[in-house]
């Protein structure tokens, strides 16, 4: 009997060790200018509903960064549970501009909300997990450039920068020429720092984002899902005040989770003084760049997570 028990124990141990390991979550920091356009809030909602990602924290950039941080922190609060403990750090404030969506978070407070310290937070988390942290940058690249300038060793410690920005073969309108995209042209110098730093880049330019317009059926599905998080998105959508949102920023998140959502090319990209992202022939590639996507498939992916 003892021999049989030993055989069974050994067999069980072998069976357990032969099971495939659970996929590890990707630690990320979301750097965002949430509150101006509506797509940042939709991107954060996708992060919250993606178990493949481990959100270490949110940092805010551009204009009234403290108001943006309050908005991000309240959206996380609405998600409930441990999301309420995810730290949110404001970046360096710039000249404030009116941001309608931030009215929703006026007066909101939380122990997870920090009025400054975005770059220091990034550096601390990356130092704790060298070579493992991905930054998802969906605003201008001011914070990321400041991080790289403050400590050049960061370039070798960041696993990846996934960003929404740039324009390769088309602009905002269908069949339009490439143009200076907002996140890049808002701070071309910062973008130049990031693109020349040697950090691997995953780039979601206008080529795979400008066509991602959430139609009436998609909006109805999202806004009638009636969770606290989708209810918050509904309120922010109405404060935003336009009809059809283009989900630029969620694509940067989606490409990280499921690379098959976009056809990509390995390209050498440089940023000029006007904020154009130029393809440079004959140089080693510094970016994996989204070139084509299927909007229907993207929205099936997005809504299956945020409003299943």
Indicate residue ranges for each PLM-predicted region.
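Surface-exposed loop and adjacent secondary-structure segments within mature catalytic domains
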Residues: 86-113
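Conformational coupling and interaction surfaces
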Residues: 24-25, 43-50, 54, 182-308
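Short, hinge-like loop/turn segments at secondary-structure boundaries
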Residues: 74-77, 220-222
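Positively charged n-region of N-terminal signal peptides that target proteins for export
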Residues: 1-6
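Short, well-ordered secondary-structure micro-motifs
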Residues: 99-101, 172-174, 214-216
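Bacterial N-terminal signal peptides
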Residues: 7-18
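A glycine-rich helix N-cap at a beta->alpha junction
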Residues: 75, 79-89
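Active-site histidine-anchored catalytic micro-motif
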Residues: 23-34, 38-74, 83, 110-205, ...
